[in-house]
Amino acid sequence: MSCTPCRPQKRLTRPRSQVPRVQTLATEVKKGGVEVLAAVPLSEETEFKVELFVKPVIGNTTAAQDGREPTPHYWSISSAIHDKESGSSIKVEETPDADTTVCYSLAEIAPPDIPNQVSECDMKVWELYRMETELLVVPLVNALGNTNGVVHGLAGTQLYFWAVGGQPLDVVGVTPTDKYKGPTTYTINPPGDPRTLHVYNSNTPKAKVTSERYSVESWAPDPSRNDNCRYFGRVVGGAATPPVVSYGNNSTIPLLDENGIGILCLQGRLYITCADMLGTANSRIHTPMARFFRLHFRQRRVKNPFTMNVLYKQVFNRPTETVDAQVGVTEVTMVEEIGPLPPSIQTTLPTSVNLTQLPRTVTLQSQAPLLNTQQNSK
């Protein structure tokens, strides 16, 4: 007898649960108010590098003359700070001299023009994607002199700050104490009562660093703004804390955010703000001689925020000259052939099916300067 082969039994498998498919949405990244697209490949024409030294700024006590504001002092050592004594206690300096106050240094860079920058769909802008910065400092030993045979060095409060952005740095106005008012000349002080400005509140004034008259003791970077900006700062306190400054040309700072986008120069400008303090010696504030920047740019495409209609109205349809013209002039509108009348004169003329019987000339009175003095309707 021949035996029949056994059929293999089918395994009972459980139905595999279907993994739900996650719906992927198009990622739209906005920065500086525009939609950011891809970066332009690097080449000699799409990359740009600039180096600059930014000098420290000390306020000026000179009053304004002939309506012109005093220029800042580009010093590395301030004037002597004088304490006001009342009996045995030292009062807080409420209105210090401007030449004892460190202000934010400001620099502006205009990258070169990009050929064929704007198209109907997108436009190319410069993007700052990495940088190097360091302080220009030297050790101070003999330069500080000695007292009673003891050589003194720098010590005290220190500040290290820099910022780069496509717009000027946004700052908030605060005061260190409820009595501090700031210098009476040169510097721009926060408006308001110092008793309410020494802590942040809804009435805290906000501003942009558009000049070198903003004191570091009265204005601080605004963390709620500065979207298209990168800044870094460090404050070291202590009456006898010596400065520790490291410098070298082997460190690079990337400026890309979590989406891989750097600082966009949407207005064709890059604004650099910095302020540094090494400490005090002999009642004077010492700063570095300068802060060095090496900036690396590349080109980035962004979605064109302007339609052709907007460009036509803002660029081409704008009068080249501003004149003070008459407003009570008479406009003559010619109505030719048979066609609908302008809405502005339909209510003043009798309606009729046969428009050829209507007047061919209509006179209107205008109360504003006229742009189009003659209108032809077919």
From Swiss-Prot:
TM annotation in the entry: none
Transcription keyword on record: no
Known partners and oligomeric status: Homomultimer. The virus capsid is composed of 72 icosahedral units, each one composed of five disulfide-linked copies of VP1. Interacts with minor capsid proteins VP2 and VP3.
Aminoacyl-tRNA synthetase is among the record's keywords: no
Organism: KI polyomavirus (isolate Stockholm 60)
This protein's name: Major capsid protein VP1
A Gene Ontology BP annotation from the UniProt entry: virion attachment to host cell
Protein family according to the UniProt entry: Belongs to the polyomaviruses coat protein VP1 family.
The organism's place on the tree of life at top rank: Viruses
CC terms in the record's Gene Ontology section: host cell nucleus; T=7 icosahedral viral capsid
Region (Disordered): 1-21
Cellular location(s): Virion; Host nucleus
MF annotations from Gene Ontology: structural molecule activity
Function recorded in the entry: Forms an icosahedral capsid with a T=7 symmetry and a 40 nm diameter. The capsid is composed of 72 pentamers linked to each other by disulfide bonds and associated with VP2 or VP3 proteins. Interacts with sialic acids on the cell surface to provide virion attachment to target cell. Once attached, the virion is internalized by endocytosis and traffics to the endoplasmic reticulum. Inside the endoplasmic reticulum, the protein folding machinery isomerizes VP1 interpentamer disulfide bonds, thereby triggering initial uncoating.
Swiss-Prot/TrEMBL keywords: Capsid protein, Disulfide bond, Host nucleus, Host-virus interaction, Late protein, T=7 icosahedral capsid protein, Viral attachment to host cell, Viral penetration into host cytoplasm, Virion, Virus endocytosis by host, Virus entry into host cell
Pfam families: Polyoma_coat (PF00718)
